[in-house]
């Protein structure tokens, strides 16, 4: 169908959307008025990572097309844990940990969208405002009566855990009710009509839409995004070294740029649509590049994604430094990792060094790297698993260049012992 709403047309043309409830009516509404829409994030970490970047970009586009983004921080629901897409229960967090995580997520989101009091400015809300004071008996009577356990057992978040005979606590089973109730409260308090989430949230979102109908609220809508997978079927946002955080203090802009520069050829066009603001015509032209030229598309993807997350100045600086390192053999822009001189004098095992500097996550992955001839010291391939970094490696130089594959490099420097 032809969409009238600029926002929905944009989302569908870029490949964001998976499913939507009553899309014809939602399209009509969004083409005629400013719609208040929300996306929720539980406070399980101090930052969001690339796995949440689709949702963050949608918030940015909502604002750009004249709608009002509402960000719901689940400081209340984090105390329970969402079972969607999870194989096991999450560890319980303390109130202080949840608060610290909420503040960190807010700082990340401020880089992507504008918060304020204007009609299209983003609004930050916490669901502890209404969940912490709930009376359990009243909640069961007024809200719980509208939910069928039979239906709840059919949703993937519940069904898959039960089929695998994995524990699903009663606490987690209640998460769907609380997320549905969040939608109702956001409508009552902030006139929110649309909830957006990942495809694994479809059951919870539809339950919220249905709860609104049973409580005779204005029609509510739900929209889910496609699951963010690479062409090889892996979830986005993780590397061998850990999560790709959107907080520059937890994952450096240099590494962020490199993450997108190193995506597979098959993913470049899709990621340009999802994670940059280049026009579709520009993206189509970049998709025409083949062979070695596709690296130019990857550099543009990396620089544009870094610009949105970390700012124009940092993105250009990182891109220029990368050009020096990888195309001009200039090591000046490499990150530095310090090792104690005493350890090097004794002989620092290469397996240990690779883990210390987080180039590899485990000794087994470090061994695989060496076995595949992917580890280099000063551009010389390391062939010996038992190789030890020594002072001889620092002869006539202030640093040792450590390389893992063609695209990961850093400078190892000596730190004086105190």
UniProtKB/Swiss-Prot annotation:
L-tyrosine binds at residues 38, 175, 179. InterPro entries: aa-tRNA-synth_Ic, Rossmann-like_a/b/a_fold, S4_RNA-bd_sf, Tyr-tRNA-ligase, Tyr-tRNA-ligase_bac-type, Tyr-tRNA-ligase_bac_1. It holds the Pfam family tRNA-synt_1b. GO terms for biological process: tyrosyl-tRNA aminoacylation. Its EC number is 6.1.1.1. The keyword Nucleotide-binding applies. It is found in: Cytoplasm. Its main location: cytoplasm. Residues 348-413 form the S4 RNA-binding domain. Catalyzes the attachment of tyrosine to tRNA(Tyr) in a two-step reaction: tyrosine is first activated by ATP to form Tyr-AMP and then transferred to the acceptor end of tRNA(Tyr). This is Tyrosine--tRNA ligase. It comes from Ehrlichia chaffeensis (strain ATCC CRL-10679 / Arkansas). The gene is tyrS.
């Amino acid at each position: 169908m032809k969409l009238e709403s600029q926002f929905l047309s944009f989302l569908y043309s870029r490949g964001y959307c998976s499913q939507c409830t009553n899309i014809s009516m939602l399209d009509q509404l969004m083409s005629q008025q400013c719609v208040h829409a929300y996306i929720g994030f539980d406070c399980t970490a101090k930052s969001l990572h690339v796995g949440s970047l689709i949702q963050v970009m949608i918030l940015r586009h909502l604002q750009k097309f004249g709608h009002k983004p509402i960000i719901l921080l689940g400081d209340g629901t984090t105390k329970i844990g969402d079972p969607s897409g999870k194989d096991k229960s999450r560890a319980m967090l303390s109130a202080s940990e949840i608060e610290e995580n909420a503040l960190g997520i807010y700082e990340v989101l401020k880089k992507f969208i504008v918060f304020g009091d204007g009609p299209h400015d983003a609004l930050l809300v916490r669901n502890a405002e209404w969940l912490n004071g709930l009376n359990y008996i009243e909640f069961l009577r007024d809200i719980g009566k509208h939910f069928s356990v039979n239906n709840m057992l059919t949703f993937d978040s519940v069904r898959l855990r039960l089929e695998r005979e994995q524990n699903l606590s009663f606490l987690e089973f209640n998460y769907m009710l609380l997320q549905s109730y969040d939608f109702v409260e956001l409508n009552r308090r902030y006139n929110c009509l649309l909830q957006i989430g990942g495809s694994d949230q479809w059951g919870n979102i539809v339950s919220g839409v249905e709860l609104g109908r049973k409580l005779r609220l204005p029609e509510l809508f739900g929209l889910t995004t496609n699951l963010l997978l690479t062409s090889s079927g892996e979830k986005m946002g993780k590397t061998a070294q850990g999560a790709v955080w959107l907080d520059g203090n937890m994952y450096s802009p240099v590494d962020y740029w490199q993450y997108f520069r190193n995506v597979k050829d098959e993913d470049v066009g899709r990621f340009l649509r999802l994670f940059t603001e280049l026009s579709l015509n520009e993206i189509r032209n970049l998709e025409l590049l083949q062979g070695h030229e596709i690296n130019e598309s990857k550099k543009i993807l990396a620089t544009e994604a870094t610009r949105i997350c970390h700012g124009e100045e940092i993105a250009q600086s990182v891109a220029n430094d990368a050009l020096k390192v990888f195309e001009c053999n200039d090591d000046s822009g490499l990150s530095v990792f310090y090792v104690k001189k005493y350890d090097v004098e004794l002989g620092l095992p290469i397996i240990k060094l690779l883990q210390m500097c987080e180039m590899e996550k485990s000794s087994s992955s470090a061994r695989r790297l060496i076995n595949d001839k992917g580890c280099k010291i000063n551009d010389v391939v390391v062939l010996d698993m038992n190789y030890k970094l020594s002072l001889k490696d620092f002869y006539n130089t202030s640093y040792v260049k450590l390389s893992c594959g063609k695209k990961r490099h850093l400078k190892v420097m000596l730190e004086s012992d105190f």
